[in-house]
């Protein structure tokens, strides 16, 4: 396996946009809380490390991963955030419940990203066993919460830049298409 015993959550602060003025929401599932607390801690610590003041990070808890969708929707509607991170953990069991929850949560978060103008970052572990989740929530593979926080900063920055250089302010090409000037954004390649 290419990721075996490799921490995938390291980041270079110099490649991340300034985040001190952004406001983030984090919606955390209480189910499998040993894992979701580790993911939350990774996300929170990464946001703080990237100069987001603690008072600009809002945390809401929901009972399970399926409820992340509603929690994120309400946070988007009421909290004036620049991005939301949803944190959950679904571990394979003996029934199809795992498939239904994973599919529903994935589609629900995708729908929020399509329907709203605020990025929602998916940090829901869908592992085969508890050890895989431990390894990805602060264990040998790093912390997916950390990775989600960095993604949230980058997406909040993209949203900010897109509103500054709105495409309707750009000239039309002779073909009638909008000419959009690209704003360089440093994003690490994985």
From Swiss-Prot:
Its EC number is 2.5.1.78. One of its GO terms (biological process) is riboflavin biosynthetic process. It catalyses: (2S)-2-hydroxy-3-oxobutyl phosphate + 5-amino-6-(D-ribitylamino)uracil = 6,7-dimethyl-8-(1-D-ribityl)lumazine + phosphate + 2 H2O + H(+). One of its GO terms (molecular function) is 6,7-dimethyl-8-ribityllumazine synthase activity. It is an enzyme of class 2 (transferase). Pathway: Cofactor biosynthesis; riboflavin biosynthesis; riboflavin from 2-hydroxy-3-oxobutyl phosphate and 5-amino-6-(D-ribitylamino)uracil: step 1/2. HAMAP family: Lumazine_synth. This is 6,7-dimethyl-8-ribityllumazine synthase. It comes from Flavobacterium johnsoniae (strain ATCC 17061 / DSM 2064 / JCM 8514 / BCRC 14874 / CCUG 350202 / NBRC 14942 / NCIMB 11054 / UW101) (Cytophaga johnsonae). The gene is ribH.
């Amino acid at each position: 396996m290419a990721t075996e015993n490799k921490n995938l959550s390291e980041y270079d602060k110099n490649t991340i946009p300034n985040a001190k003025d952004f406001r983030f929401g984090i919606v955390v599932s209480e189910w499998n809380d040993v894992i979701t607390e580790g993911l939350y801690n990774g996300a929170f610590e990464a946001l703080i490390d990237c100069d987001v003041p603690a008072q600009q990070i809002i945390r809401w808890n929901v009972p399970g991963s399926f409820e992340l969708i509603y929690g994120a929707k309400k946070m988007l509607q009421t909290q004036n955030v620049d991005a939301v991170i949803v944190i959950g953990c679904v571990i394979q069991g003996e029934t199809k419940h795992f498939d239904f929850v994973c599919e529903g949560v994935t589609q629900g978060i995708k729908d929020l990203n399509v329907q709203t103008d605020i990025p929602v970052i998916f940090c829901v572990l869908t592992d085969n066993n508890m050890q895989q989740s431990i390894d990805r929530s602060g264990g040998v593979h790093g912390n997916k919460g950390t990775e989600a926080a960095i993604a949230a900063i980058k997406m909040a920055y993209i949203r900010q830049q897109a509103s500054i250089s709105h495409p309707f302010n750009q000239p039309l090409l002779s073909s009638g298409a909008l000419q959009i000037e690209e704003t360089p954004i440093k994003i690490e390649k994985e």
